Curated annotation (Swiss-Prot):
Protein's name in the database: Frizzled and smoothened-like protein M
Residue segments, region Disordered: 552-590
Residue ranges, Cytoplasmic side: 265-273, 339-354, 419-439, 516-623
The family this protein is said to belong to: Belongs to the G-protein coupled receptor Fz/Smo family.
GO cellular component: membrane
Domain spans labelled FZ: 25-163
Keyword annotations from UniProtKB, A to Z: Disulfide bond, Glycoprotein, Membrane, Receptor, Signal, Transmembrane, Transmembrane helix
Protein encoded by which gene: fslM-1
Residue stretches of biased makeup (Low complexity): 555-580
Signal peptide: 1-18
Listed transmembrane segments: 244-264, 274-294, 318-338, 355-375, 398-418, 440-460, 495-515
Location of this chain's protein in the cell: Membrane
Extracellular domain ranges by topology: 19-243, 295-317, 376-397, 461-494
Amino acid sequence: MKSIFIIIFILYVFQVNSQTIYPIDPSGKCEQYIGDTPSSPCSKFLNNLDSIYVSSNATQQNAMKKLDEYFGILGAIGTSGCKSDSLTYKTLCSIYLPGCESFTNNQTNITIAIPKRICYNTCNNVTTKCGVPKFYFSCDQIEPVSGLPMFPLNYSEFNLTNYDVGNPNYTVQCYGPLSDNTMVNLDSSYCPPPLFYHNSTDHDADYDRGYLFVSETSNCVVPNPVPLYTNEQWDQLYNLSNTLAVLSTFGSLYLLVTFIILNPKVTSFDRMYGFFNGSVFMMSLSGVILFIAGGPRALIKDGGARISVFEDPLCSSTGFIFQLFAINAILFWAYMGFDLWWRVKYITKPLNIQKYYVPIAFTISFIFSVIPLATKNYRMVRGNIHCWVHKAVLQNTLFFGPLGLTLTISTGFIGLVIYEIYKIVKATGRGGIMKLEIKPILNIVLIYFSFVYIFAFNFHNDNNSKNTYGSIDEFFQCTLESDDPSKCTVGGPSIGSLGYFIYCIRIYGIYCFFLQGLNERAFKIWKRSIVFNNRFILFIKVKLFSMDNNSPSESGNSSTTAGTSTTINNSNINKKNNNSKPTLSTMDSNAFSKNNDSDSDFDDYDPYHKKQNDIEIGSVNIK
C-alpha cells in the first residue's frame, strides 16, 4: 500500500514538472526590430532592439498592426494615469515584441530561439491601472499549444538537452520593466475605426453641438448612427420609417379631405375624429419632410461624427412639429375614449364639451412644445430615427408624463366601455351593440397599445442603458479582431424592438384609414363631391357614353336604338348645360352605382345607429 502512494506521488511530481516546461518552437527566431510605425513608438521601450522573438506563425509586421490598434485605443479611451506611465508602453510593446535568447548546436549548426515573457505581476499591475476588463485582456490567459501561462510568475523553463546545450531545466527570467521618465507623444488625432476624430478644446460645448466623446480626455467621438446595428440593418429601419410616414400621411389626409372638406354635413363626430386625424397627419408629415430631405440619414452630420441639434433647421422644425401634434393626438385620443364610453352608456344623451376641450387641448400642446423650443432642446435621438425633445427631465415632464396620465385614464374608460357593453348584452341577450361599436373600439384599443409600447420602450431603454454602455469594451474587442469592423455592434435594444417602436410612432394614419375611411358613407361623400361632379368629369362621361352607344351590336335595331338613345341623351345634356351648371341631377349616376341614391344620404350622420336600432334593457325600450 505504501509503495502505491509513492508511485502516485512520483507520477504527480513528474506531471507537475512536465507542465512547467515550455515547448520550443524549432522555427522560432530572433530578429532585429523592424522599426516604429507612426502610431507605435516601441523603440523607446523595448529592452533589446537587436533581439526580438518571432515564432513560426507570427511576423513583426502583424505584431505592429496589433500594436497600432492598441496604441490607438489607448490614446482614444485610456485614462490619463495610464497614458502618462512609461510602464504601460514597455509592457504593451514587450507583450507583442518579446525579448529573445538563442542557442546554436555546434555539431548541427542549428539555432533555436526562446522568448522572454512579461511577468504576471507586471501585466496585472498595468491592466489594473489602465482599467482593462479581464474579458477584454486577461493576464491569466494560457498559451494555446502548451496550456501553460502566457505570463509566468517568475521564469519560464525549457528542456535544451535535445539541442546539445545539456540543460534539461534551463530557466529564463520573466521581464518586469520599471517605470521611468520616458515620455511618449501619442498620435492624438488617431482614432480606431469606426470612431471619428474631432479636434475639440471644449467637450461640453461640442456635446451641445451633437458630438459624443468616448471619454473626457479623448477627442474620439462615437459614430452615427450609433453602432447598435450594422449599416444594412439601419437602412432597413430607415426605410420602414419612410414608408410608414408616407402611407400614414396619405391615409390621414384622405380622412381629412373626405369627412371635413368634401363632406356636405360635418357632424360633431366628424369634428372629433378630424382633430385627431389632423394631428396624426402633421405627425406623419414631419416624417415625410424628413424623407424628402434624404431620410433619417439627413440628420447625421460631418460624415457621421455628429447628430443634428437645435441649430440645424431640419431637426428643430421636424422635432417641433412632431412634439406639438403628438401631444395633440394623445389629448384628442383620450377624448375619443371618453366619448366612446359616454355614447355607449347614455346612447341618446349628447356630449357637448368639444367647444371647451379643443382650445384647452391646443393650448396644452402648444405650451409643451414651445418649452423645448425656447430652451433649444430639440435634437436627434441618438440611436433612433427622428428629432425630438432632448434631456430626460423634459421628455418625462412634457411627453411621457402626459402620456402616462392619459394611458391611465384611458385604461379606465376602455374598461368601462367593455363593462357597459357586457351589461347591455347580458340584459338584452343580443350582441348588436358590439357590432355597432367594433370600429371605434378597435381604433381606441390599437392606438392604446401603440402608446403603451412607446411608453414601455422608453423606460426599458433608460433602465438598461448601463448594459449598453457596459458593452463598449466588447465592441472595441470586436473591432480589433474582426476583418470588417463595420460589422461590430454595441449591445442595446434588439432591432425588432426598435423596429416596432418606429412602427408605433408612424402607424396611426394607416390604422385610421382602414377603420374610418373604407365604408359606405365615405364612398357616397366622394361620389357626390365636386371631384366627380365637375365639367371635366361630365365631359369624360359623355364621351364614354357616346363610345358605348355607338359600338357595333348584333342587330340593326339595337344599333338604331342605341343611336336614338345617344341623341336623346346628348340633347338632354346639352339642354341642361345651357340652362345651368352641372349638378348631380344632370348626370347618370350609373357611372358610380347601380342604384340612384336619394338626398337622404346627407341626413345627420349617425355612426352608432341610434335611430335605426332599439336596445331593450329589461322592460325598458331605449331608442
